[in-house]
Each structure stands twice: as structure tokens, then as C-alpha cells.
Amino acid sequence: MLETDVIVVGAGPAGSMSAIQLRNYGLTVLVLEEHSAIGKPLHCSGLVTPRTLESAGMDHSLVLNEIKGAEIFVGDVKPLVLGNEVTRALVIDRVAFDKYLANQAVLKGAQLNLGHRVTHIENTPSGTTIVHANQKTFSSRILFGCDGWRSKVSTHLGNTKKDLIWCFGGEGIVSNHPKDMVRVYLDAEIAPNWFGWTIPLDNKRVRIGIGTTFGSPERKPIHLFNKLLKQYPTHFEGLTITSLSGGFIPLYTPQVIESRNSLLIGDAASHAKPTSGGGIYTALEGAKTAAHTAYQALSSIQAGPVQLNSYHSAWSKTLGKELVRGSELRKVFMDLQSNNQLPTLINTLSIKPLKKMVHNYGDIDYPSALVNPILRVASAMIGPALQLSKMSRASLPLKRFVSQLASQK
């Protein structure tokens, strides 16, 4: 049995970028992907920032549409319209995106085995990891878990609890949707603890989705999806649905993401952003950190067990800190939504100085960057920050968040 430096389980963005980076360091890499085709089944909305394409080392050839802003709806209040002429996000061909990264990994020299579902993992006293897949046995000195929210590697590390968002959606054709604007729906009755969305692919095609926390049968996303269509009929006039899909988003929660010789990256590590559910950018950046950690470990110990205990601290100093802040922001959002305070927030953010702050500082990848500017403007406009009318109950988690934000600076 030939031993590989690193076995990567999963050939999504996390796995393929890991393989690319590991090969850049001259390490031997085997990628095991359970599906027979890269990028399928599709479970992602495909909305990313330009920063994500840069991180992937990719040009705009896979971009289907450019997004300049958002329309945010909740209840009967006037929608909050954000955006200008600046491109804020990109709609990508997600299947082609995954294929591109996987092909780059193969071109770099990684071995890719499709249709290989990992069934068992074991560690040996010598420091080697044995991986069983498709009645075959593989061995490596280091194991990367990039195998999504149901990660076999994560289970091997002892993780059992995840904060899952249950999603349902698809693609369709509508009569009228702004080509350069996404729509976000915050109503608690159609997306409890999360939100709904429409993302235009072009002048007529849209991606539609809804999400909620895993819970009671009446919260099944397919039922909430139908509620969304009924509650906003003018938005879905002439809708013809062309495809449907569902899945889960593992929002950031503290997990064991490293062991002596195993690392978790991307959704396997529950590294999806708590505010938006996006996980591609965090997966790409996590893969780079993980690959560097593996290279350093293998360079320092030529034989025998390795130690990967620097990965968590390195990750925590970069995007890890933002994910912690994002978790606090999500608590604020859920409190506002459950207390029916989101309409008040939408009205407040429509005030010109606050809206300007959102335009200037809003960032899908780093949402916490918006908090302090908003609070400064709010404080100057209406007295002490957080004393927004009708929001006293909902202000407490925001106070906790600001306190934590200040302590981490």
C-alpha cells in the first residue's frame, strides 16, 4: 500500500484548493470524492464576492451576472433598497467553478479518485492514517476533511453537534426581476431564524431559495418556499420552475478542527458564515492555511507522527475571528426577528446617514466591519447608541456583540 503525504476527502472548493496548495508545496496528494461528477448535486446559490474569485485565482469567465445591490423585504414596511454602481457580488456557474478548481488540482499533480465514498478511518501507532473507500485501502501521514456538513472526517474527530440551516430552492424563469439586484426576505413566518432570497442569473432566470433552522414538520423548507411564493406574488409573476434542490448549511460553531494528523476545512469544519451562510470564501482561505500547516509539519518531521496543532490558532487569527463576530450578529438578528423588531430596523436603516454607512462599509465576507460605523452614526443622530425606538428588548444582544467586538480589537 503506497503512502501519500496527504489524503484529501472531498473535491469541492475546500478540497480542490487544498490539493492545489499542497502540490504547490511539493507534497503528494490523493483526493477522494464520493460523487461520480464534480460539482453535482448542486446545493449552492452561487453568490460570491469578487474577493472570492481572486482567492480562487480565477478570472470572470464563469461569472453569469454582476450584482450591484439588494432589496430587503419584511412585513408591510417599505423595502430597504441598498446599492449603487459598484459591483458588490457575482453570480457564478457553481458547477463550472468546482470543475475548474478540481482540474487545476489534477494539472498540479494531485490524484483525483471519483466515486470513492469514505466508509472508515483509523489511525495507526506509527502516525499513519488508514482510509477505507470503495473496498479499497489508502494511507497517508495527514488527512484533510473537506467532505461537507456530513463529514466522515469530522465524525472521526469526535464532532457531533452542528448548527444547521435547512434550505430548499431552485431555478426558474420570472416575468420581471431587477437584473443587478438580489432580493432578501426576512419575514419570520416564511423563514424563521433565517431568510429567503432571489438571485438573478440574467434578465429572466433567477435562483430562489428559503432557509430555516432544523425543527418541526411545519418548518419544512418546501412548505416555507411555497409560502414565500404566495406572500410576494408580484415578485414571482409568470414563474416557471426549471429545477429544485435542497440541502443543509453548517453555520459556524466551535468544533474540533484539528487532531494530531487530521484537519477540517470548509463546511466539514462548520465554517459557513453565520450571517449569510456563504462558505466558499472561508473554504478557500481555510484550505490555504491548512496546506501551509501540513507543509510545515511534514518539513519538520521526516518520518513518524506529525503534529498539526498550529492550524486552529492560525485560522482563528484570520477569518476565525470574523466568524465569531458573525455568530453574535446572528443572535442579534434572531432576537430582532422573533420580537418582530426587524421592520423597525429596516425603517431605521433607511435613514440617509445610516444607509450611506451600509453602502460604504457593507461587506458580505466581513459583515462586522459595518457595526461600529453604524453605531457611531446612530449615536450622533439619536443619542446614546442602541437607544433606537421600540428596540429596547432587542438591543441587549447587540450590546453584548459590541462589547465582544471591542474586547477583540
Positions of the model-derived regions?
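Glycine-rich FAD pyrophosphate-binding loop
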Residues: I20-L42
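Beta1/beta-strand and adjacent pyrophosphate-binding region of the FAD-binding site
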Residues: M1-G12
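A conserved beta-strand/loop capping segment in the N-terminal third of enzymes
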Residues: T49-Y100
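FAD/FMN-dependent oxidoreductases across multiple families
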Residues: H120, S216-S299, P305-V306
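C-terminal helical "tail/cap" subdomain of flavin- and related membrane-associated enzymes
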Residues: Y295-K409
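Conserved N-terminal glycine-rich FAD pyrophosphate-binding loop of Rossmann-like flavoproteins
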Residues: H35-A56
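N-terminal Rossmann-fold NAD(P) dinucleotide-binding loop
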Residues: G15-S16
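Predominantly flavin-linked oxidoreductase catalytic cores and closely associated redox partners
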Residues: A11, Q104-E237
